[in-house]
Amino acid sequence: MAPEVEPKDIPLGIYSHLNFAFALIDPKTFRIAPMTDATAKRYKALTALKNRQNGLEVYIAIGGWDFNDPGPTRTTFSDLAASQSAQDTFFDSLISFMLHNNFDGVDLDWEYPTADDRGGRPEDFANYVTLVKRLRERLDQLPKHYGLTITLVCCVILRVLER
């Protein structure tokens, strides 16, 4: 969601799903954190649109392009995917975050697994599958159905397949 778009300005009756971009993963604790204070203030305003459109689902997107830029979050997804303990912490935090903000699901936007120029590692390919599988299993244990989507970037997948 662009900063200039407020939830109240989103036309209803057009979309079945909305993804709010973004929330972040703390690189030290693996807990979910708002991208900024401004985005945190919009979470509940966006999920409140569900009261005005029957069947609308709102997901939180986590990560994004600059999440793998040089800096403290560059290897966060790789570190998360490589550790079941970190995943368990992440899952607990994510579920609490979604419940608190009334989200219906999550979109994992990891750009780019395995890309060494974006902080990736060769083992990301297999670890990502395990991460998504474990998250789906964990979400399926909850009384409410939560959606899970992933953002895949085709150029990375082609790069892996070429190896």
PLM regions and their residue ranges:
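Active-site cleft segment of glycoside hydrolase catalytic domains centered on the general acid/base Glu
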Residues: 72-163
